[in-house]
């Protein structure tokens, strides 16, 4: 048994398998950041912080001594509770193929959104600076007319190249912007195809973000550091329900300020 305490949950192996499958499917469907940043191997439950490699000057304890603190970034634990019906869980053992796992999917979607917003917008309470505020490139404005979006993306790519940032490059679009470029054509040619010709990486649906981001995916510029990856744990139960949660521990580091361009409405 570990500190997820899953062995204490009144959940059969077959039900666990379905719950985990729904959680994994939903999380992967909504997550975008992990497709464009480096993801370090999980350090394990004992990992409380990651080193930045920097030193911080501190007052020496006595004359003739130079003192420094090793700078580090603490990991934040993100937990999303959800509740399942015991009848829905037990129905799996009786052969049910349509148990209601909507609470699982809602929790997985929420955790994916929180992780992506942490990566792109930052999380000041957890000492995490996001890609938007860390970027040293001037932010660009997304036009209202989707037919003008390729020109702005091209401008963002030029900013990256002029800053000496090599590709491949990817573009992340919020849900509304992605819909616009997918549904709009210019002289019979889909805007999405215009973007595909400009970008040598991926055009990514990123529902958690606002606006868009253009960044390099060459590696070494952005790092999602995990203590424990996404997992399901047990909280409690009664005669009718089982209370579980999705959880991960992480921090995020931006190493190269010039490796991204943010686009806002």
Swiss-Prot record:
Principal localisation: other
UniProt PTM: The initiator methionine is partially removed. When isolated from culture filtrate isoelectric focusing gives 3 bands, none of which are glycosylated.
Phenotype of the disrupted gene, per the record: A single enc deletion survives less well after 3 days in 2.5 mM H2O2, pH 4.5 (mimics growth in the phagolysosome). A double dyp-enc deletion mutant cannot produce encapsulin nanocompartments, cells are highly sensitive to H2O2 at pH 4.5, mutants exhibit significant dysregulation of redox homeostasis, survive less well in C57BL/6 mouse-derived bone marrow cells and are more sensitive to pyrazinamide treatment in infected BALB/C mice.
Underlying gene: enc
Something else known: Stimulates a strong IFN-gamma response in memory immune C57BL/6J mouse spleen T cells, recognized by monoclonal antibody HYB 71-2.
Function: Shell component of a type 1 encapsulin nanocompartment in situ; its cargo protects against oxidative stress at low pH. In situ and in E.coli assembles into proteinaceous shells about 22 nm in diameter with 2.5 nm thick walls. Cargo proteins are targeted to the interior via their C-terminal extensions; empty intact shells can be isolated in E.coli in the absence of cargo protein. There are at least 4 possible cargo proteins, DyP (encoded in the same locus), FolB, BfrB and Rv1762c; DyP and Rv1762c have been identified in vivo.
Localization per Swiss-Prot or TrEMBL: Encapsulin nanocompartment; Secreted; Cell membrane
PANTHER family: PEPTIDASE U56 FAMILY (PTHR37165), TYPE 1 ENCAPSULIN SHELL PROTEIN (PTHR37165:SF1)
Alphabetized Pfam families for the sequence: Linocin_M18
Keywords: Cell membrane, Encapsulin nanocompartment, Membrane, Secreted, Virulence
Stated name of the protein: Type 1 encapsulin shell protein
Gene3D superfamilies registered for this protein in UniProt: 3.30.2400.30, hypothetical protein PF0899 domain
UniProt organism field: Mycobacterium tuberculosis (strain ATCC 25618 / H37Rv)
Similarity annotation: Belongs to the encapsulin family. Family 1 subfamily.
Subunit structure, as described in the record: Multimeric. The encapsulin nanocompartment is formed by 60 subunits. Monomers form pentamers which assemble to form shells. There are 12 pores where the pentamers meet as well as 3-fold axis channels and dimer channels; none are larger than 3-4 Angstroms in diameter. The N-terminus of the protein is inside the shell, the C-terminus is outside.
Cellular component per GO, a single term: encapsulin nanocompartment
Top-level taxon of the source organism: Bacteria
InterPro entries given in the database record: ENCAP (IPR007544), Encapsulin_nc (IPR051429)
Membrane-topology descriptor: Peripheral membrane protein
């Amino acid at each position: 048994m570990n500190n997820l305490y899953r062995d204490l949950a009144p959940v059969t192996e077959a039900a666990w398998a379905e719950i985990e499958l729904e959680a994994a499917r939903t999380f992967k469907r909504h997550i975008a950041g992990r497709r464009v940043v480096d993801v370090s191997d999980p350090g394990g439950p004992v990992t409380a912080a990651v080193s930045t490699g920097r030193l911080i000057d501190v007052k020496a304890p006595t004359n003739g001594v130079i003192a420094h603190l090793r700078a580090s970034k603490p990991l934040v634990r993100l937990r999303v509770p959800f509740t399942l019906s015991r009848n829905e869980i037990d129905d799996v053992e009786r052969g049910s193929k349509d148990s209601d796992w909507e609470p699982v999917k809602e929790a997985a979607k929420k955790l994916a959104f929180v992780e992506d917003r942490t990566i792109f917008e930052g999380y000041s309470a957890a000492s995490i600076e996001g890609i938007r505020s860390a970027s040293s490139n001037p932010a660009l404005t997304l036009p209202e007319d989707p037919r003008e979006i390729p020109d702005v993306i091209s401008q963002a790519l030029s900013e990256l190249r002029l800053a000496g940032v090599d590709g491949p490059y990817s573009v992340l679009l919020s849900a509304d912007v992605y819909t616009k470029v997918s549904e709009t054509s210019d002289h019979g040619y889909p805007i999405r195809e215009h973007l595909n010709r400009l970008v040598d990486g991926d055009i990514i649906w990123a529902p958690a973000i606002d606006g868009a981001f253009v960044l390099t995916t060459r590696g070494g510029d952005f790092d999602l550091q995990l203590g424990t990856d996404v997992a399901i744990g047990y909280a409690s139960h009664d005669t009718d329900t089982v209370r579980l949660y999705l959880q991960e521990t992480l921090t995020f580091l931006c190493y190269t300020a010039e490796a991204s361009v943010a686009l806002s409405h």
